[in-house]
Amino acid sequence: MLKIYNSLTRQKEEFRPLEPRRVRMYVCGMTVYDYCHLGHARVMVVFDMVARYLRHLGLKVTYVRNVTDIDDKIIRRAVENGETIGALTARFIEAMHEDERALGVLPPDHEPRATESIDDILAMIGTLIERGHAYVGSNGDVFYAVASFPNYGRLSGKNLDELRAGERIEVDEAKRDPLDFVLWKSAKPGEPFWASPWGPGRPGWHIECSAMSTRCLGAHFDIHGGGMDLQFPHHENEIAQSEGATGEHFVNYWMHNGFVRINEEKMSKSLGNFFTVREILARYRPEVVRFFILNSHYRSPLNYSDENLDEAAAALSRLYTALRGLAPDLPLPLGEDRDEGFSSRFADAMQDDFNTPEAIAVLFDLAREINRHKAAEPAKAAALGATLKSLGNVLGLLQTDPEAYFKSDAGGSGLSDADIETRIRARLEARKAKNWAESDRIRDELKAQGIILEDSAAGTTWRRE
């Protein structure tokens, strides 16, 4: 039975979907005013893994991940760039899709945009006003009345009195309560706006997700995910809005992935340790980055460093090395087990709150077993190799042909395959002539350019670092 850590109850719970064999899941997506950074990549990869595994279990998953395409940051960036908001957001939405494709992230079933959901947003705000959960402030903005929702703070564990007393609360005289948050912002000169019963304006960030999730998945659904940084106030506000508007319990399981750290420090533009996905992909293969993300438990901090990425690259190469040179479709001897319990161990790990590090450890045990059988029992090795590829596929890994993986250029050597093969032949001639110095020179020259030679009884193979 799959168990998920529920941020709402702060414990692991057996996952029981609202409808048998069907799962509805919503994840907060990007605010598209810049390129994806590693934090965005983690959200994309983590919840792609969740959706893949639920589908692997035979469940019908409806996965919704929104796009915030109107926001204060978007407006500021468009002004700075001297371009329209539409041009800015279109460019970064396309860049986001390129990055997620590179990382092996399957597209969500629905990707609603805030600007395409204005009618739903207006309807929800109207309902909240009717039910006494929202009001029009003295400045024309519409605010959510936090005091009207007794369960506010349940997700984050925040104490309302302490929040009110906190020095960080910005005092806004238009509000009845310092904790009240904006649902509809009245129009300001030079900013985009839409007509509403409360005057022209645009939606606040929090109401967008409530409106889009309930439209796509209904008032009550199974899983809501996002980064830990969104737990408060964003997800807390979503609960207040959605339950205030519908009168129903909003979400059964709340999932939050951990923070990204750079060299043991919090990732931050102000600290100068901020990396976009594109900057990382210029140095590392996309599959290495995906492997790196999944090799930490989704709730744990993810510590980015060159050393950790290099270790991920070496580890992934070991898995591909196990798959290299396997004979396809060899029949196993009668009664021979082609799995040896690896699939069961993998499932046990994944059923325990998507424990991908433990699941990946099973893949390495499987790879060692393949290597042990390669020479003496090729049929056994091939069968185990099929299991390794199948389990890797559940995580979106190990789907490239091993030879193609090792020979693809990951941004290192400029040598062509033909150049490399020519030098390997020259090295072979040197070895035949017992010219070991020349043989070593060619090997070292290739290594300096990121080409690793591997000698065996079957001959010499090569791979790019």
From Swiss-Prot:
Per the record, a Pfam family? tRNA-synt_1e
Has keyword Ligase?
yes
Name any cofactors this protein relies on.
Answer: Zn(2+)
Motif residue range(s): 'HIGH' region: 30-40
Principal cellular location given in the protein's record: cytoplasm
For this UniProt entry, the molecular function terms from Gene Ontology, in alphabetical order, are: ATP binding; cysteine-tRNA ligase activity; zinc ion binding
Question: So where does ATP get bound?
Answer: K269
Top-level taxon of origin: Bacteria
Protein name, entry field: Cysteine--tRNA ligase
